[in-house]
């Protein structure tokens, strides 16, 4: 058999099937497109469903691909086995109603055994078939010439996922020899058994039956072929290594981990687990981020966060206690190009995301692990189960994925009370949902609304007024025929100019009236059957069903909403231009007085980036671009480059808002006719709303002008107070004052140190020897919390081999700080000292092994805490 690099195997596979008339289907992104049934692309066939189910017809019925995939159903096994992965590549050849078993088997045999391709020894190959699949048996035995003893019948060789296409399959195994085990049926040492000797290298699925609702099977009119070969596994066979992790897909990563950790791979089984976890997870994380996913608290983002934090936890077992996963991204990129250039192209962005996430987790990891270890001790002494409320606190406060807590618990021989954990999670979801609920929204999503099916046409794209008929009135949750003045009512119209809240754009407000009554409209939403449902208060008169009315939108607000919505599109495009294509809309709010835009990005924008975005948007406004709005089919919209919002669902016909060439986006909202109508755009804030999500708030038109006018007024006031004549002198004067303040503060700090030193006397005389350690434990009189740290720095410079613990009372609040020489941190940890002391003074604290700080609210107990910590050190 040829010894080939993984990249060579991939290319040979594609080349072989191209020779056999197959079309190469490029590897699709890991984040599924137009398929809400999948969290990730998890197989080679997942991206081809559109061909198999008939939605699209491929250019050729023969297809070959190498598809990157993610599976996360058994993350806890990754690292502990030879071949479990969360990220992998699946090589596959497919036939959509073209060739079937004969060709599929012959192709597989030729690719594996021909010297031109893999060059495997035929006498080392075995196959499994379904017991009733005589056609496959005859092909293998009579046409290929495989001995009967190397064809194993296994009942499980039938691919079936319930109702739909199904069929038998045949698997091909490679015998790695007696070094991997002696033949012994009792130990499943046979092809198809759980063993390391006979490795499955290819699975050929023959989709020939339809699994019917009554569980009967009928032949399919068009038979299909679906095969899968794991690249990592084939590489391990070709390169003759024991596990996938020793192939050229992983070893460069292992080598880098060895350099960083100082530990060796393949020397210690326990260490090897950590090596494998880190190597597997960094591949998954790098590829997922390159394809548009970001760490978050739910969905696929939660999977990434869980993987990264699991890898960080295992890296600690190798002595790596700082962010380093991001440094592996370049190695992954080098291994996987040129077939996957995306990781290298986005490497800087991927590294920034990973480093940011690592830093966040490291901030809480030590405290979280310390708490978890205490919970484990408590559980072992009582119920052998970690309390669900405690597990939830670890998740909520310290960022520990519950799966990570479970995994550590299992390693300690314990379990987690998941029932209580889920209850706590549900309570949190309920609280969040309650907080999001609009108190003004209609709470009558009842059978009343569901039973109203009469049409209501929105005409507001073209007009802000309409002559229409009031068709339904709902009062106190019931449909009625009339409502009196002063009452709040919900109603529908045959035609309405009022936009219903949707896509981040708020609803229109206005009035609906005739000579007999008037309703002030405050809210418009979508009813269950799609009609616009208006809410308002009857200002005067009696409202009757069937009344002919005038409907008028508040046009001032409408114009401002239009400006803000069109500006939001320009902002989205500008962010992509300045920050990169990874930017996706994560939420928006378009109101009359402001706009808010949430987007995916790994960290705060710089002032320069904000300025660039703002300038780009204003340039498009000043160009006076016509805003063309058209309805078309989704395919035509995508062809013209229209941007679809990530995660949004669209029908067959979509509305395209075109401000070409800068912005083309699918949108159902209301917009200006020309960008010049927006007038002016000003960003007023940029902030974070969660991991990987940033928020911009901005103003347009008159609101932006008034905002700048207010800033100018404040600037003039400041200029007057600084007593300078020109605008240019303001910054110079401020810099001068800041420098003077720093100098004065430095003088004051030095004087405080001198006063403290005089009060303390000779500190060397106060050092005690406790349990073999030099220790200084004392209360200091300082003017503020910052001064206690500077006092500590002063003491450390004089007592370099001494454990120092200081406490102070500042404004009836306790501040404490501890330092331990690095040479002693294996035995004494500053963080532990503070954690022991802080509760005594009614507080908490912690930190690194060499430096920690804390505080409390009970200064009367300072002496008690200092005495306690001396005894604590004495008993270490």
Swiss-Prot record:
Annotated residues for binding of Zn(2+): 565, 569, 667, 671
GO terms of molecular function: alanine-tRNA ligase activity; aminoacyl-tRNA deacylase activity; ATP binding; catalytic activity, acting on a protein; transferase activity; tRNA binding; zinc ion binding
Subcellular locations according to the entry: Cytoplasm
Domain of life: Bacteria
GO terms under biological process: alanyl-tRNA aminoacylation
This protein's record includes keyword Zinc: yes
UniProt-listed SUPFAM superfamilies: Class II aaRS and biotin synthetases, Putative anticodon-binding domain of alanyl-tRNA synthetase (AlaRS), ThrRS/AlaRS common domain, Translation proteins
Cofactor binding remark: Binds 1 zinc ion per subunit.
Any one GO CC term of the record: cytosol
Signal peptide coordinates: none
NCBIfam families reported in the protein's UniProt record: alaS
UniProt-recorded name of the protein: Alanine--tRNA ligase
Organism in which the protein naturally occurs: Staphylococcus aureus (strain NCTC 8325 / PS 47)
The organism's taxonomic lineage, starting at the top: Bacteria, Bacillati, Bacillota, Bacilli, Bacillales
Gene name of the record: alaS
